[in-house]
Amino acid sequence: MSRRSTPKKRIIDSDPIYRSRLVTMLISHILKEGKKSLAQKIFYQAMKNIEEKTEKDPLKVLQQAVLNATPLVEVKARRLGGSTYQVPREVKAERGTALALRWLLSSARQRPGRNMVAKLTNEIVDAANETGNAIRKREETHRMAEANKAFSHYRF
């Protein structure tokens, strides 16, 4: 890998139905084995279910869920003199959103049941209401950063 220049950022197109980049990112995360049409079907059905369940705009519910699940700080391992420290650091907006989407999906996949649409619907609604595993994961990350605040002077 070349060390000369940083790679260019990928430009993410907005999806055709909701005109949102966030939706495109989530569909890409749902994607398994290149089956994008199946991922889109799962997501759009989940959005319909969210609308029926909450009687609110599903895009607003999704945005609120992602906002609630987005971490502000994280810990990163830093090796110094034979011991490894968990150093807290702020999370940039893009990485925070990506982490929130990843946590939402992994929490949805861990839920009991076979229907991914129902699992994703419930996880998004729970995250919008500040409950659920994705929110628990964010709080756990914040607790780790708080516990290791003493090492915050170690920079990268």
From Swiss-Prot:
CDD domains: uS7_Chloroplast. This is Small ribosomal subunit protein uS7c. One of the primary rRNA binding proteins, it binds directly to 16S rRNA where it nucleates assembly of the head domain of the 30S subunit. It comes from the Eukaryota. Its main location: plastid. GO terms for cellular component: chloroplast; small ribosomal subunit. It is found in: Plastid, Chloroplast. GO terms for biological process: translation. The keyword Nucleus does not apply. Gene3D superfamilies: Ribosomal protein S7 domain.
